[in-house]
């Protein structure tokens, strides 16, 4: 199956997981430019999807790869995706970020808050001094950095597809958001959850 199709499978698994866990979820449909008149402008979605959990809105941009890193290339992570996720941080009770799926060697998914992503991207591209434990790639975000700065999305493989425990993820992210006032807090700080 092609990479694009695997990305759609990932989106469908996230959507089904949300429905199974009774989470309000909305997936924004992409416009297929092939169905438009020649020269028609294609609207650009702000996010792939969002979900609502316990008074918080989570705008997500989903990325899937079989590689060990996800490129910063504008073909992969589009400027408007970064722009709108960053803009969403201005509002209370909104936790925006990426869901990065690394399909191989074993399916791993990480939520990376847009602020943590932008900090890493700036350091990586400018080759600045940093405190990351793992190797910094100038042109991509590797799985090791996602493990370090992100929050793992727990999952269970069924016969073919995955169920992602989005309720647990959102509970963890809300606790991290609520503790943001504390000094030196980032989204990769471990927290105890009772979700």
From Swiss-Prot:
Superkingdom classification of source: Bacteria
Molecular function terms, GO-annotated: nucleic acid binding
Protein name per UniProt: SPbeta prophage-derived uncharacterized protein YotM
Organism listed in the record: Bacillus subtilis (strain 168)
Gene expressing this chain: yotM
């Amino acid at each position: 199956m092609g990479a694009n199709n695997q990305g759609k499978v990932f989106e469908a698994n996230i959507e089904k997981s949300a429905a199974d866990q009774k989470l309000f979820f909305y997936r924004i449909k992409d416009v297929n430019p092939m169905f438009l008149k020649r020269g028609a402008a294609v609207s650009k979605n702000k996010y792939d999807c969002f979900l609502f959990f316990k008074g918080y809105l989570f705008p997500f941009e989903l990325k899937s790869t079989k590689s060990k890193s996800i490129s910063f290339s504008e073909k992969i992570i589009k400027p408007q995706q970064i722009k709108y996720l960053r803009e969403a941080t201005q509002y209370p009770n909104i936790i925006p970020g990426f869901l990065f799926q690394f399909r191989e060697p074993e399916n791993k998914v990480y939520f990376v808050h847009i602020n943590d992503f932008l900090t890493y991207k700036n350091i990586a591209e400018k080759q600045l001094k940093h405190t990351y434990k793992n190797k910094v790639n100038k042109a991509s975000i590797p799985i090791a950095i996602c493990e370090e700065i992100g929050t793992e999305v727990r999952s269970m493989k069924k016969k073919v597809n995955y169920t992602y425990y989005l309720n647990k993820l959102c509970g963890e992210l809300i606790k991290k958001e609520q503790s943001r006032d504390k000094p030196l807090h980032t989204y990769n700080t471990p927290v105890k959850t009772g979700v």
